[in-house]
């Protein structure tokens, strides 16, 4: 699963996920992309499940890019622990997603195969997504 090799600080504040994606909002590496139209978080496990779904469908053909990285630690306190006594330990990592962000890209497959692979992958993700293709001349 994806996670940072090391961080300057183990824990991070919650923050607010606002605005729309101004970077990473167009297909840059592949021919087709999976774009999120919702705002939210994608965990490393969800990204890995979606990646496996794409890889299984396209088999040996095609090259896949994951355009987001889960670098934000989410802390949790253990079950049945009283409130207080500090912040919990980091349990998993998430990628904050704004509307318009490209999550996956693929090249080397037909449009029909890419559409079906991304449809299978989007079932693994908690956000609404749409299929996009590279603009002519890019």
Swiss-Prot record:
UniProt keywords (A-Z) are: Ribonucleoprotein, Ribosomal protein, RNA-binding, rRNA-binding, tRNA-binding
A GO CC term assigned to this protein in UniProt: cytosolic large ribosomal subunit
List the residue ranges of the region (Disordered): 1-22
Q: Which GO terms describe its molecular function?
A: rRNA binding; structural constituent of ribosome; tRNA binding
Tell me the disulfide pairings in this chain: none
In terms of PROSITE patterns, this protein maps to: RIBOSOMAL_L16_1
One short Pfam name that applies is Ribosomal_L16
List the CDD domains hit by this protein, alphabetically: Ribosomal_L16_L10e
Compositionally biased spans, kind Basic residues: 1-13
Q: Which GO terms describe its biological process?
A: translation
Q: What do we know about how this protein assembles, alone or with others?
A: Part of the 50S ribosomal subunit.
- Into which family does the record put it? Belongs to the universal ribosomal protein uL16 family.
Tell me the function of this protein.
Binds 23S rRNA and is also seen to make contacts with the A and possibly P site tRNAs.
Its recorded name reads Large ribosomal subunit protein uL16
Upper lineage ranks? Bacteria, Pseudomonadati, Pseudomonadota, Betaproteobacteria, Burkholderiales
Encoding gene (name):
rplP
């Amino acid at each position: 699963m994806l996670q940072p090799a090391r961080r300057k600080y183990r824990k991070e504040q919650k923050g607010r996920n606002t605005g729309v994606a101004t970077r990473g909002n167009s297909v840059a590496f592949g021919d087709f992309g999976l774009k999120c139209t919702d705002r939210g978080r994608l965990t490393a496990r969800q990204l890995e499940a979606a990646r496996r779904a794409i890889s299984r469908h396209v088999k040996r053909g095609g090259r896949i890019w994951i355009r987001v990285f889960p670098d934000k630690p989410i802390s949790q306190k253990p079950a049945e622990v009283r409130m207080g006594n500090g912040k919990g330990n980091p349990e998993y990592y998430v990628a904050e997603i704004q509307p318009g962000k490209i999550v996956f890209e693929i090249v080397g497959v037909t449009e029909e195969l890419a559409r079906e692979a991304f449809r299978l992958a989007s079932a693994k993700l908690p956000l609404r997504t749409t299929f996009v293709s590279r603009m002519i001349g890019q």
